[in-house]
A protein has these predicted regions:
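A short, conserved, highly charged catalytic patch centered on acidic carboxylates
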Residues: 1-126, 132-155
Length: 155
């Protein structure tokens, strides 16, 4: 397991008290958080809160370049279209995939299987999963997963 000391960051959150009607269903609008990486406001879900904290850790503490971070992009897994949470590039190639879960979702075999499916398409060297409290990571060497105790240095 990887221990993360999250940096202080002045997140911009705007409450959204309006509600919208969709057909006969009344839907309460959600608060939003400004994502400085995507440069837009996004719905503040529990998973998004984990994602934003992980992104700040990677950028501020690990010094991963902002320009080489992709967030919530679609990929094809056979006939299925899926979205990864975070992808870090190195030399224009996928280098690290990070799957974010909300705080009360355990990082388990299902999460690792999901990451490994993404890896089959993206061929990244590193795989990580976090729910904000628990973070696990692995490097792929000769087709096998090797557990990591830290995020690798960005080269």
């Amino acid at each position: 397991m990887i221990e993360i000391n999250y940096p202080q960051y002045p997140f911009k959150i705007r409450p959204n008290e309006a509600s919208t009607s969709i057909g006969k269903v009344q839907e309460q609008a959600k608060d939003q958080i400004f994502d400085p990486f995507r440069k837009k406001w996004v719905v503040l879900t529990p998973e998004e809160w984990v994602r934003q904290n992980i992104l700040q850790y990677l950028n501020q503490v690990c010094q991963y370049p902002t320009a080489l971070i992709a967030i919530e992009k679609s990929i094809q897994l056979g006939e299925l279209t899926k979205r990864f949470d975070i992808l870090i590039y190195n030399n224009d190639k996928p280098w690290m995939i990070i799957e974010c879960k909300k705080a009360n979702v355990a990082i388990n075999d299902k999460t690792i299987t999901q990451l490994y499916q993404y890896q089959q398409v993206l061929e990244a060297q590193y795989l990580f999963a976090s729910n904000g409290h628990e973070t696990v990571g692995a490097e792929i060497k000769t087709g096998k997963l090797h557990a990591l105790q830290n995020f690798p240095a960005y080269l």
